[in-house]
């Protein structure tokens, strides 16, 4: 579950909502139950509505944003409203691991008797759809402790709306028609809906008094709401510097199911838990902020999913796209990072069996789309269906049809073989160690023969029956950044220099060089236009993490100041796009606007991991 909106509380996306929850009884999507809660200040019979909605015809109502005097989110989002002599503070916090939003209203100042009125706007719809006025929606509600519960449609959970203070609920059902979401308009989607308001809550408030509102799929003890809110605020990391913003963002990707399984969400607001994203982001989101325990919890769930896949059993975990051919390779990389943090002995004890099983599974050629060829390289078919992280499709076909020998797959494979060979030696499994070393040697030799070209960079993918792909893409950086590289030091430096000249931006690496054909750096416009641009020049911060790791590997401390300057581009982003986090991607040309999902796990993770690497190289 999540809560998401703009700082003036005007929803601009269909994904926005005050309480957005999964409803597994219906489908695998999140659903907006409570779209917004409009507060109205009443004094001497005069009403001042603090809400804000955009309606068709570019009309905004009731324009409550004009009363906002301050906004900050150092710990939790806090808005200060001034209406004449009334000063009202609103603080919002989402209860960790619960489907509950809490809002605390504090009357900071008032010179007359003051009443607050709260009008909830209900949607009860999927984040992928809109709702409109209809006769099917139920208007029934039941009174609960200091509030009500209601449910608009069968199959949905009840929505409990409760306050910490006694109040009067006035049943006055109505539909607010033509609410419009401009960001959906920009993307060429349907953009308006109708929202249902069952009535309003009303209560008096004294100067200095605080009232807590709770919206959830379960009832709460209203006597505990004040303490519950205070406890949640106490647990939050302050956003008082760049690092703390990232730590706070990292925790937002933590996901726990009712079965107590632990996952990493790929991003907000529309991404689920994806296998590749999980393993790439897991080290940065946990190990880089000294949270090894959560790494182990996620890996416990992920390991179960990996074994189910490798053993051909029905998949029971909620980690999607586990069948993608490079997922197993990224799992090895994630465990490799764990070993560097906790020591190889503990890592071997916990994960040696999983590592060996993954390597043996690949060697046995059991992965349906990861075939080990006689030259020691891995081959994947990606012409008809995208199989790498560059997975955008248009008209049913991959925009970037990466197929054959894919550069990062084979860099990861070489790294995995070398890492597991060392592990096998440490465990006394000399025969396995020798086999892994032999395969790594063959893979490394073939890698150089296959991918290195006369211009000093690497082919992105090579289909033996076709000409190699000459596009300059960032995937070659992994062959430099990984602990074990099949390239010579001179070749590594050459690859890094090409990435620096043609791909580096203040927001990460471009997905395609401006000198290559098909360069399209602007991620704007309708869906098809964005699909074609997705991996054709846009900049990705998570790739920048591996670039900076490669820089430190090749140039050591001499590049520290350069990398610190690069990090400024991400620090600036803390007050852009989505406050306190990093979005999915950026335009590949200045001014490098943030685009896509408002918060992306791999980006946050790799920036955190880069900060950690900087500290290690400094000392």
Residue ranges and their predicted role:
Residues 215-251, 280-285, 290-300, 489-502:
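Carboxylate/His-rich catalytic cores and anion/metal-binding grooves
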Residues 109-110, 131-134, 143, 205-207, ...:
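Aromatic-rich carbohydrate-recognition surfaces in CAZymes
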Residues 223, 338-350, 419-436, 490, ...:
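Inter-helical turn/loop segments and adjacent helix faces that build the functional surface
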Residues 46-76, 83-87, 497-507, 512-520, ...:
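Non-catalytic C-terminal accessory modules of carbohydrate-active enzymes
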Residues 244, 363, 370-373, 414-523, ...:
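Catalytic cores of carbohydrate-active enzymes
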Residues 248-256, 300-308, 572-579:
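Glycine-rich, acidic and aromatic/proline-enriched surface loops and short helix-turn segments
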Residues 256, 260-273, 311-330, 334, ...:
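Carbohydrate-binding/catalytic loop surfaces
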Residues 1-238, 242, 269, 291, ...:
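Terminal accessory carbohydrate-recognition/targeting modules of carbohydrate-active enzymes
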């Amino acid at each position: 579950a999540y809560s998401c909106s703009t700082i003036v509380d005007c929803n601009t996306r269909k994904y926005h909502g005050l309480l957005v929850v999964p409803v597994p009884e219906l489908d695998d999507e999140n659903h907006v139950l409570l779209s917004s809660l409009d507060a109205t200040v009443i004094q001497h019979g005069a009403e001042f509505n603090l809400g804000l909605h955009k309606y068709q015809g570019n009309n905004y109502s009731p324009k409550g944003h004009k009363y906002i005097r301050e906004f900050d989110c150092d710990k939790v989002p806090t808005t200060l409203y001034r209406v004449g002599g009334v000063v009202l503070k609103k603080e919002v916090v989402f209860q960790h691991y619960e489907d509950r939003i809490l809002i605390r209203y504090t009357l900071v100042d008032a010179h007359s008797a003051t009443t607050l009125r709260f009008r909830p706007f209900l949607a009860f719809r999927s984040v992928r759809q809109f709702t409109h006025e209809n006769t099917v929606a139920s208007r029934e509600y039941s009174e609960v402790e200091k509030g009500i519960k209601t449910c608009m449609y069968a199959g949905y959970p009840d929505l409990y709306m409760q306050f910490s203070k006694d109040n009067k609920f006035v049943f006055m059902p109505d539909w607010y028609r033509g609410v419009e979401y401009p960001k959906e308009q920009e993307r060429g989607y349907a953009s308006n809906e109708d929202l249902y308001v069952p009535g309003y809550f009303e209560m008096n408030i004294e100067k200095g008094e605080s009232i807590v509102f709770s919206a959830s799929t379960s009832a709460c003890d209203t006597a505990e709401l004040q303490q519950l809110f205070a406890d949640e605020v106490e647990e939050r990391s302050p956003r008082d510097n760049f690092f703390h913003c990232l730590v706070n963002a990292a925790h937002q990707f933590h996901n726990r199911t009712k079965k107590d399984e632990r996952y990493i969400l790929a991003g907000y607001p529309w991404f689920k838990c994806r296998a590749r994203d999980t393993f790439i982001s897991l080290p940065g989101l946990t190990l880089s902020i000294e949270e090894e325990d959560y790494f182990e919890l996620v890996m416990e769930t992920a390991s179960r999913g990996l074994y189910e896949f490798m053993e051909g059993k029905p998949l029971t975990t909620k980690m999607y796209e586990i069948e993608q051919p490079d997922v197993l390779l990224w799992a090895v990389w994630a465990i490799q990072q764990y070993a560097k943090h906790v020591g190889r002995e503990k890592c071997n004890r916990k994960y040696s069996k999983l590592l060996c099983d993954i390597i043996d599974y690949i060697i046995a050629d059991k992965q349906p789309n990861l075939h080990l060829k006689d030259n020691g390289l891995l081959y994947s078919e990606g012409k008809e269906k995208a199989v790498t992280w560059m997975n955008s499709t248009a008209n049913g076909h991959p925009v970037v049809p990466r197929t054959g020998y894919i550069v990062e797959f084979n860099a990861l494979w070489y790294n995995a073989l070398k890492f597991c060979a060392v592990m096998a030696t440490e465990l006394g499994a000399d025969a396995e160690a020798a086999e892994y070393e032999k395969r790594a040697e063959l893979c490394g030799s073939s890698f150089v023969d296959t991918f290195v070209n006369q211009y000093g960079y690497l082919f992105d993918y090579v289909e033996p029956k076709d000409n190699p792909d000459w596009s300059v893409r960032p995937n070659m950086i992994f062959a430099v950044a990984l602990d074990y590289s099949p390239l010579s030091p001179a070749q590594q430096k050459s690859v890094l220099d090409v990435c620096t000249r043609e791909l580096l931006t203040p927001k990460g690496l471009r997905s395609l060089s401006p000198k290559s054909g098909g360069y399209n750096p602007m991620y704007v416009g309708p869906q098809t236009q964005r699909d074609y641009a997705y991996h054709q020049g846009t900049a990705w911060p998570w790739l920048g993490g591996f670039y900076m790791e490669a820089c430190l590997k090749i140039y050591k401390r001499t590049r520290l100041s350069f990398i610190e300057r690069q990090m400024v581009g991400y620090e600036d982003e803390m007050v852009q796009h989505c406050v306190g986090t990093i979005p999915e991607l950026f335009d590949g040309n200045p001014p490098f606007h943030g685009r896509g999902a408002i918060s992306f796990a791999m980006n946050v993770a790799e920036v955190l991991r880069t900060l950690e690497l900087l500290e290690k190289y400094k000392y």
